């Protein structure tokens, strides 16, 4: 006898006729007049539960098996047999059922209903992993995460753990969560009445990071190829389906790399990750295609087989102005492209993933390399059909005098970035990188449109439960 996951049984990793023990939770119980019960037991290792055929000859059949309801936890031992019914290749002829946990009141068990709205499930974030949709999201999220780590490992990158607490604003937007141990009801003040952060834990103002990029650059300028993969925070008061206050970012940084180099890196990473999901999580993708978005499988297959188009921002604006489409937000040179513009380019004009590059400097961050025209920077966005922007990146400004000029233009104190400026003073090199919002990637792959449903415990304005 061996402990087996449901997935390993369905994959044929255990011989027909062998005895295995499966541990999980009851999804359903059906009883037949012939004195047999059918238990659907789910352990989360794959989308489908396994069927256990339980005879009434078991010692605890009447007093326990017939009382099992959805959500009860069980340890089931039985012989693997080929299933005569459609839908699964194998089932268990059960010889032993151990009940490890009962549902206190089946009538009030929140997950007992056949179907809940996705909005209602957000109020039950501690129980929603038990549902088909959130379980499938979790497995796909894990698959994508593992694939991304694997991709960078196989390509010689070093994973760097960048700090979550920082004194630097990477984006220069100021939308940061402050970290403080000061007594909010008795704040120390300076002589001019301002909060005296010298008395705070770090002796200065500190914040939750909006990006690991600046710290990542320091390691790229020593180890050549690095990436970060961790949580980031934005105090942006946007209560939309596309925004979270806490989300995960993948941020590679490569020394001696140009904008073209990281555009190729982004394409390789996305295709690698999507191929992994297509190969490893087809059961979950089939669920999403049936119940969430019928195009998900076809969209991923099309993505991995397409060459990325490339277009300059200036040319993209020209395409949008001449396309004859009336957009909600009018198009002119100098604007940041909105989602409707991005999706038109990817879905209707190029009909493929597209890299838009060389954006106006005034709508991009201080660290992006100024182009020779003095008006644009070496920035790029990767636009995907079906969602729009999925990656943003740039060649970094490696010239100290130009970096200082950009900091001044954006009214940022260069003394706050002294260590970042040091990279340009001691052996500076051209280098480039990008950021991938991981939840947006999971949303794209699953078709689950609200980003709050693709992270286990969403953090958003007025939402910090659990």
UniProtKB/Swiss-Prot annotation:
Gene Ontology CC, one term: cytoplasm
The entry's keywords: Aminoacyl-tRNA synthetase, ATP-binding, Cytoplasm, Ligase, Nucleotide-binding, Protein biosynthesis
Coiled-coil blocks: none
Gene Ontology terms, MF aspect: asparagine-tRNA ligase activity; ATP binding; nucleic acid binding
Protein's UniProt keywords contain Aminoacyl-tRNA synthetase: yes
Enzyme Commission number: 6.1.1.22
Record's catalysed reaction(s): tRNA(Asn) + L-asparagine + ATP = L-asparaginyl-tRNA(Asn) + AMP + diphosphate + H(+)
EC category name: ligase
Cell location: Cytoplasm
Pfam family, one: tRNA_anti-codon
Biological process annotations from GO: asparaginyl-tRNA aminoacylation
The family this protein is said to belong to: Belongs to the class-II aminoacyl-tRNA synthetase family.
Entry-linked PANTHER family: ASPARAGINE--TRNA LIGASE, MITOCHONDRIAL-RELATED (PTHR22594:SF34), ASPARTYL/LYSYL-TRNA SYNTHETASE (PTHR22594)
UniProt name for this protein: Asparagine--tRNA ligase
Lineage of producing organism: Bacteria, Pseudomonadati, Pseudomonadota, Gammaproteobacteria, Alteromonadales
Gene name for this UniProt entry: asnS
């Amino acid at each position: 006898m061996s402990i087996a996951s449901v997935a390993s049984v369905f994959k044929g990793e255990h011989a027909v006729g062998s005895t295995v023990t499966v541990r999980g939770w009851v999804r359903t119980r059906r009883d037949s007049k012939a004195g047999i019960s059918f238990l659907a037991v789910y352990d989360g290792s794959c989308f489908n539960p396994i069927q256990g055929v339980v005879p009434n000859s078991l010692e605890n059949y009447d007093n326990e098996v017939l009382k099992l309801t959805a959500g009860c936890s069980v340890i089931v031992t039985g012989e693997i047999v080929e299933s005569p019914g459609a839908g699964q290749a194998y089932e268990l002829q059960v010889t032993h059922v151990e009940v490890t946990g009962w549902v206190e009141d089946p009538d009030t068990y929140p997950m007992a209903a056949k179907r809940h709205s996705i909005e209602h499930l957000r109020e039950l974030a501690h129980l929603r992993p038990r549902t088909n949709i959130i379980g499938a999201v979790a497995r796909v999220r894990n698959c994508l995460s593992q694939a991304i780590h694997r991709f960078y490992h196989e390509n010689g990158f070093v994973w760097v753990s960048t700090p979550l607490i920082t004194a630097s604003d990477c984006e220069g937007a100021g939308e940061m969560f402050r970290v403080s141990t000061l007594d909010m009801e008795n704040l120390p003040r300076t002589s001019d009445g301002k909060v005296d952060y010298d008395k705070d834990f770090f002796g200065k103002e500190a914040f939750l990071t909006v990006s690991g990029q600046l710290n990542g650059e320091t390691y790229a300028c020593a180890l050549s190829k690095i990436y970060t993969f961790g949580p980031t925070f934005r105090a942006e008061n946007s209560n939309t389906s596309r925004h979270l206050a806490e989300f995960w970012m993948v941020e590679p940084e490569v020394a001696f790399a140009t904008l073209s180099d990281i555009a190729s890196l982004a394409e390789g990473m996305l295709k690698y990750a999507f191929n992994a999901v297509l190969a490893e999580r087809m059961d979950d993708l089939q669920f999403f295609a049936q119940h969430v978005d019928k195009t998900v499988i076809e969209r991923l297959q099309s993505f991995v087989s397409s060459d990325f188009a490339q277009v300059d921002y200036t040319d993209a604006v020209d395409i949008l102005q001449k396309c004859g489409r009336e957009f909600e937000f009018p198009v002119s040179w100098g604007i940041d492209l909105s989602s409707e513009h991005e999706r038109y380019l990817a879905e209707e004009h190029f009909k493929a993933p597209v890299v838009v590059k060389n954006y106006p400097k005034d709508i991009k961050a201080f660290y992006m390399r100024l182009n020779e025209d003095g008006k644009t920077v070496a920035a790029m966005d990767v636009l995907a059909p079906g969602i729009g922007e999925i990656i943003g990146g740039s060649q970094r400004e490696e010239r100290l005098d130009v970096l200082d000029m950009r900091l001044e233009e954006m009214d940022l104190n260069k003394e706050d970035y002294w260590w970042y400026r040091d990279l340009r003073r001691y052996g500076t090199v051209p280098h480039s990188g990008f950021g991938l919002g991981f939840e947006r990637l999971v949303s794209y792959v699953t078709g689950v449109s609200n980003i709050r449903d693709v992270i286990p415990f969403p953090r958003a304005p007025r939402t910090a439960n659990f």
